Amino acid sequence: IGMIVECEKEGYLMEANGCKRSCTLRPGHYCANECSYVKGKNGYCYAWVACYCYNMPDSVKIWDSATNTCGRGK
């Protein structure tokens, strides 16, 4: 008998250009909605700069400083 366990992750939502999803000048619920859209359970606008989400599926791409491509034209 097997069991499938999906590890859920947290982190900054990432745009197609590799940058963090900005929440500057957005309404308070913006990040929570964006996190919900990718099947995250909760999220908020971190320091009024970028959307941070909790409990997202492993398939969601998140921003990572080690692989950051923001502003590099990729």
Swiss-Prot record:
Residues that bear Arginine amide: 72
Domain of life of the organism encoding this protein: Eukaryota
One of the GO BP terms on file: defense response
Subcellular location: Secreted
GO molecular function: sodium channel inhibitor activity; toxin activity
Disulfide feature: 19-70, 23-45, 31-51, 35-53
Record InterPro entries: LCN-type_CS_alpha_beta_dom, Scorpion_toxin-like, Scorpion_toxin-like_sf, Scorpion_toxinL, Scorpion_toxinL/defensin
GO cellular component, one term: extracellular region
Domain LCN-type CS-alpha/beta: 9-71
Tissue expr: Expressed by the venom gland.
Family statement: Belongs to the long (4 C-C) scorpion toxin superfamily. Sodium channel inhibitor family. Beta subfamily.
Protein name according to UniProt: Toxin Td6
Lineage of the organism: Eukaryota, Metazoa, Ecdysozoa, Arthropoda, Chelicerata
